[in-house]
């Protein structure tokens, strides 16, 4: 029997939360439903928990688990799992978030009516214990996104606003990811890439004004900022900046390459934004791994204010940078 929707739960190193996330996936009211539990080669017990829960499941959904042989990153993971999916619509769930029972139903019904290239929804914020922190949160629209794509007259707009898709609450037609070429290496910022491609194709992103997931806020999340001012906290924040910067370079390269492969009509101003973003990643990545001379050489790569704002306080070493940060944040 064919299924119209696949709910894919993707996880990496989430053994403390994945069981609860899977339980919420299995509790979906939509039927017939395929559920794929997919692990990105976690070194912890994430995949073992997936296998255990598939083995013990007795219910109406078609459920199976898969594992990447090596860690491939979010974009390749979504490409692979979409190629394996049977549903026309692929609903994405993270291994530490909770999908509410009617999530798949609500997304599928809205998508069947609109034909959007991506779906998303409001969400509730929960802590690591599952305690409610905030209800009915709409992921904010980015003023920067509006500036980046301002010249794209064919971009789909909702009351004049260009929508983006928050990856943690997203759903896509299976073909969106399945038809992409494999990226040359691991990419993590899948929602930035997806939003850019959908906008440049002139397709629609639809957000449902109701909470369909419990989005878990964790200290280690890429979307949660650490605010401590101790040396250890500052070093940790710098590591996260470096991590994001490396990914930014790879994602922008893949995006620019895909725009070229598809022959999309992109305004020169938009392409300038893309290239400046890639350059910013090159300016900020691996900064503390290079020597003092190489740090000063990066001054010649400054293209935008954000490049200078990153470089200037860091040029004279980490100790002075940490002292300045503590001084001006008090």
Predicted regions and their residues:
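C-terminal subregions of glycosyltransferases and related glycan-biosynthesis enzymes
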Residues: 156-160, 166, 187-188, 192-193, ...
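Nucleotide-sugar donor-binding/catalytic module of glycosyltransferases
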Residues: 1-232, 327
């Amino acid at each position: 029997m064919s299924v119209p929707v696949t709910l894919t739960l993707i996880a990496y190193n989430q053994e403390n939360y994945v069981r609860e996330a899977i339980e919420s996936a299995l509790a979906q009211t939509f039927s017939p439903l395929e559920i794929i539990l997919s692990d990105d080669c976690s070194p912890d017990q994430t995949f073992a928990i997936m296998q255990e829960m598939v083995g013990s499941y007795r219910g109406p959904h078609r459920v199976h688990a898969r594992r990447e042989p090596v860690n491939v990153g979010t974009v390749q993971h979504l490409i692979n799992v979409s190629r394996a999916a049977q549903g026309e619509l692929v609903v994405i769930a993270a291994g530490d978030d909770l999908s509410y029972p009617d999530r798949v139903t609500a997304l599928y019904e809205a998508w069947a009516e609109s034909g959007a290239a991506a779906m998303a929804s409001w969400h509730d914020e929960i802590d690591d214990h599952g305690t409610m922190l905030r209800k009915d949160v709409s992921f904010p629209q980015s003023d920067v996104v509006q500036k980046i794509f301002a010249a794209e007259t064919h971009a789909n707009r909702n009351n004049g606003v260009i929508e983006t898709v928050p990856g943690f609450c997203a759903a896509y037609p299976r073909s969106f990811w399945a038809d992409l070429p494999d990226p040359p290496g691991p990419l993590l910022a899948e929602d930035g890439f997806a939003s850019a491609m959908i906008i440049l194709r002139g397709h629609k992103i639809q957000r449902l004004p109701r909470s369909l997931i419990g989005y878990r806020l964790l200290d280690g999340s890429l979307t949660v900022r650490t605010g401590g001012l101790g040396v250890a906290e500052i070093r940790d924040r710098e590591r996260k900046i470096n991590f994001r910067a490396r990914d930014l370079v790879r994602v922008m390269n893949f995006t620019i390459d895909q725009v070229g492969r598809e022959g999309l009509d992109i305004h020169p101003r938009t392409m300038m934004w893309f290239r400046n973003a890639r350059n910013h990643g090159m300016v900020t990545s691996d900064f503390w791994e290079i020597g003092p001379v190489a740090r000063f050489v990066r001054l010649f790569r400054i293209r935008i204010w954000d490049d200078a704002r990153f470089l200037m306080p860091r040029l004279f070493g980490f100790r002075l940078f940490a002292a300045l940060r503590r001084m001006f944040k008090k």
